[in-house]
């Protein structure tokens, strides 16, 4: 019986590469010349620091562009609403979602069951395991998960026949 896992993960190497590319672009951008701005990366949290709140938002856009160039889905980013002002710099934390939250997993399982496909979906920790009789049904579930607007990107692994 074919089965697969639906997960939501960010590749840490690609994230690091996107941050490095953002730093390079930051050093060459004309609007950041002579300004204090930096991008720090620690595991799945990126801290953006700049002299102005507007510049912090520009750093978010730079990071988002570099992520999409490195095939990391920017919808996995969670950007703080307000920049923290300390001294003469503003800092903004960007965290990346790892794993599927239980509420999102429940919504995904409900969508799969409402689609009337002949598959079974079960929540296993931060993944969703889908099993079915036909491979085509699993591919339809893949399409359904990618098209769903749940605010989180999904990847598929452990595809077994």
Swiss-Prot record:
Domain of life: Bacteria
Keyword annotations from UniProtKB, A to Z: Nucleotide-binding
InterPro entries referenced in this protein's UniProt entry, alphabetically: DUF520, UPF0234-like_C, UPF0234_N, YajQ-like_sf
One Pfam family here: DUF520
Record GO cellular component, one term: cytosol
GO molecular function per UniProt: nucleotide binding
Entry function: Nucleotide-binding protein.
Family in the record: Belongs to the YajQ family.
Family annotation (PANTHER family): UPF0234 PROTEIN YAJQ
Protein name from the UniProt record: Nucleotide-binding protein Sden_0770
Organism: Shewanella denitrificans (strain OS217 / ATCC BAA-1090 / DSM 15013)
């Amino acid at each position: 019986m074919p089965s697969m896992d639906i997960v939501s993960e960010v590749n840490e190497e690609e994230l690091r590469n996107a941050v490095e590319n953002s730093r390079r672009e930051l050093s060459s951008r004309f609007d950041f010349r002579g300004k204090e701005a930096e991008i720090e990366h620690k595991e799945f949290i990126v801290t953006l620091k700049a002299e102005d709140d507007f510049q912090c938002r520009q750093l978010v856009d730079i990071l988002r562009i570099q992520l999409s160039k490195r095939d990391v889905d920017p919808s996995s980013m969670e950007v703080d609403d307000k920049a923290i002002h300390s001294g003469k710099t503003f800092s903004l934390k960007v965290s990346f979602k790892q794993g599927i939250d239980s509420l999102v997993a429940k919504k995904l399982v409900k969508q799969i069951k409402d689609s009337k496909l002949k598959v079974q979906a079960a929540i296993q920790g931060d993944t969703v395991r889908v099993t079915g009789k036909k491979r085509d049904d699993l591919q339809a579930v893949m399409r359904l998960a990618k098209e769903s607007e749940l605010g989180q990107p999904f990847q598929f692994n452990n595809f077994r026949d």
